[in-house]
Amino acid sequence: VYVVTNLPGSGKNEEEQLASGLHWHTDIEFEPVPLSTSMFYVQCVPISREHQNGTWVPDVRPADGFYHPDSNKDLNSRRFDLPLNGETAYADTASAFEDLPKEKQKELEKTQVRRRLRVSDAGWLTPLVYRNPRTGRQSLHSPVWASRGKNVAPVQIDGFSETQTREYLDELEAHVLQQKYRYDHLHQPGDVTIWSNFATLHNAPPVKSKICSPEDARLMYRISCKGEPSYHLPRKDTDEWLAANISPPYQSNI
């Protein structure tokens, strides 16, 4: 369980701070067994709308260097178009894939991406296009060159240089981030929001990262499922699979 909050801890009370939105990403796609599904259980959301434009926060842009300096302006304008009331922004990579020309779809179906956590890692090749084994619907799995900025090594398309990879994936990201594929979810207490990491990108909004008023409080719990989704019940996780892919103290009662 991952806690998403801006509630202050027990340390020194600091002045209110603003944080820009993050990179568009999927959760933990850089591991050999990625997260398939994520969900938010919402406890508390901001109710303040004190900014002059009637939103919780102003339009806070990332600092220089957040994205690659050669990223085109059209792409960056779509990246920075984020909600300002504490919503989570989503983009539908399944519909975006379906709208591509058939020849482009065939090209992408053959595309392999090398993902890795650190630049020094050899990494592993994974398909850029994911096919849902139950519905057969295809989607783009994390079509982003550098989804964690400097924190995680950029991906590389098999057979492409770094520059070719960035330009190719920037074009796909710009396609996916069109408004017709976007959905911004305004959380309410008690909401359970579930999404597929294979079929969406998402982005955390600009937030007040240090708060001075309870009206600005934001508290959600993120729960995630790892590995290929099971479409048959009961799911039978073997001890070997759990030992290789899940950190203690997880246990399966199946």
Regions found by a protein language model. Give the residues of each.
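Non-heme Fe(II) oxygenase catalytic core, chiefly the N-lobe of the double-stranded beta-helix
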Residues: 1-191, 198-254
